[in-house]
Design a protein with these regions (language model features):
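Active-site beta-loop-alpha junctions of metal-dependent nucleic acid enzymes
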Residues: 214-236
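Dynamic "connector" segments at or just before major functional cores
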Residues: 1-182, 194, 203-214, 219, ...
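Conserved structural-core and active-site-/substrate-pathway-adjacent residues in large, well-folded domains
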Residues: 116, 167-169, 208, 247, ...
Length: 517
């Protein structure tokens, strides 16, 4: 342990030795011998006189250095994140410590590649050099890291959830760049920007756990992204049967045909403008009267125009039951009515009508909004379109190729409503993980950045699933708990932070299921 010059230093060394002996790393042999308590005097024996012999003189006084903190770090947070990273199988899939540190730094505080060393230093981790970090990004881009991470995510999802249904959605990430290139192009932006952007597609399971991610040109239509992502996922994991759920933006006849020909089942949102054709029989016999929670199971034409085949015969009161053999040119359509949705739709229509009237009267200048038509150079309110929209409030449609015998209409609706999980994952990646690659310019750098975000999203979703806490609250709880390295008169020791019951519960929840206590 060291040497001591007086009884005080000896007491500190004895205490440090006891702490090491009591540690988990120190083994103990059961010899049946009771250890004898050791006593070390912190103060020397008393002298014979009160003030000593003045004639003898006093011994020179030795100054003892004050205890000082050499460093402190959030090592507990790093260990917790590294444990989840390893539990997901990423250490085995990608044997790269620098990549792991980049992923953990992205979870803790999204920042530039240059600033990663500051984040890792706060976590008590020695950071690799900037050139090593850049080489790691190149390896991630050309070394197949994304495929290996995706394979590990798939194994985790299979072990913890149901892989019979996956959810898909897209988003856009913009760049503050003046010029376009082969990847970053100006296109339809969900954030209403005119900057160059990329389109990112994300596939998740029922829990919102990421399974596949893809990057496309900024001007690529959303409908053209779902098939490449789903087919890549299907080929990577050799899946022949699963249900793909997507919103109405993915609804195109070619997409549905390609998914059906690939042997996949789908559930996509339908546009409300198709309701008059799909529900022609209902409107003929019942008008626009619906009851709250009413569900109508019918058919819808496969082509976009709806002219190839009629959806339903208005003269027949009963809705047709979709059969893939007898209705080879139609898909199954499920329509549901909700009073709550009707109230929300009516409120939105009122706002749109007010805006349209303001534009028509010239009180407000704007691009031609909904329900405004231009006739003979003058703007007019489209009363007919507004009236048709009011007849359809409260309706929501779903298109699928799943037979009613396999999945009832209520389950189709419930499966579609799980789409909020992929939207939540996108919000987490764009806000908590700052997925927008502000500092990446080349395609390889952007792809490597998205691979890190993909792995960080998997770690974040797993933390949220295990602890029940949002990522922000998890970080706010563990980050302030810092271990300290203290120098006490030459004796250097590291002391962990004190843990309360809340933190202990979080750490226990992060452990794999078999090792929790």
């Amino acid at each position: 342990m060291g040497s001591a010059r007086d009884d005080g230093e000896l007491g500190l060394l004895v205490e440090e030795a006891r702490r090491l002996l009591a540690g988990d790393a120190q083994g103990e042999l059961d010899l049946g011998i009771t250890a004898k308590a050791v006593k070390a005097e912190m103060v020397g024996p008393p002298a014979g006189v009160l003030f000593g012999d003045a004639a003898a003189g006093s011994a020179p006084r030795q100054l003892v250095a004050r205890a000082q903190v050499l460093k402190s770090c959030s090592g507990l947070l790093y260990d917790a994140l590294a444990g989840v990273y390893a539990d997901l199988g990423f250490d085995d899939a990608v044997d790269d410590e620098v990549f792991r540190d980049l992923v953990i730094a992205r979870v803790v505080e999204p920042t530039s590649l240059l600033d990663v060393d500051r984040i890792l230093a706060e976590l008590g981790r020695a950071c690799a050099s900037l050139s090593t970090r850049k080489r790691t990004l190149r390896r991630a881009s050309v070394g197949g890291y994304r495929g290996q991470i995706a394979a590990a995510c798939f194994q985790t999802a299979c072990a913890t959830g149901d892989m019979s249904l996956v959810l898909y959605d897209v988003t856009t990430l913009y760049f503050e760049a003046e010029k376009e290139d082969d990847l970053r192009k100006v296109g339809y932006s969900k954030e209403r920007r005119v900057d160059p952007q990329i389109v990112v597609g994300l596939l998740v399971d029922r829990r919102g756990f990421p399974l596949e991610i893809g990057c496309f040109e900024g001007n690529k239509a959303e409908t053209l992204t779902i098939v490449p992502i789903v087919k890549a996922f299907q080929q990577r994991h050799e899946i022949s049967d699963m249900v793909v759920v997507a919103d109405a933006g993915m609804l195109s006849s070619s997409n549905l045909r390609d998914l059906d020909e690939a042997g996949l089942r789908f559930i996509v949102g339908s546009r409300v403008t198709k309701a008059p054709g799909d529900l022609a029989s209902h409107f003929h016999w019942h008008g626009d009267f619906f009851t709250d929670g009413q569900v109508i199971d019918t058919i819808t034409p496969r082509d976009q125009r709806g002219t190839a085949t009629k959806s339903s015969d208005p003269k027949i009161k009963a809705e047709p039951v979709w059969n893939p053999k007898t209705h080879s040119r139609s898909w199954r359509a499920v329509w549901a009515y909700s009073t709550r949705r009707a109230v929300r739709d009516t409120k939105m229509l009122n706002l749109q009508e007010t805006k349209a009237r303001a534009v028509v009267t010239g009180d407000k200048s704007a691009r031609t909004p909904r329900f405004v038509i231009v006739r003979n150079g003058a703007r007019e309110l489209d009363e007919a379109s507004l009236q048709r929209a009011r007849h359809l409030v409260g309706l929501k449609g779903y298109v699928t190729n799943i037979d009613a015998a396999l999945m009832p209409a209520t389950e189709v609706i419930a499966s579609y409503h799980d789409l909020w999980r992929v939207e939540q994952s996108f919000r987490m990646s764009k806000s908590d993980l700052a997925a927008r690659p502000m500092f990446a310019r080349t395609r390889d750098a952007i792809e490597a950045h998205l691979t890190i975000v993909f792995a960080a999203l998997a770690v974040s979703r797993e933390i949220q699933t295990r602890t029940g806490l949002s990522l922000r609250r998890f970080l706010r709880t563990l980050k302030p708990l810092r271990s300290a390295t203290i120098d006490i008169n030459g004796v250097i020791a590291t002391y962990p932070p004190a843990l309360n019951t809340e933190v202990e519960a979080i750490l226990n929840a992060l452990q794999p299921t078999g090792s929790r206590h």
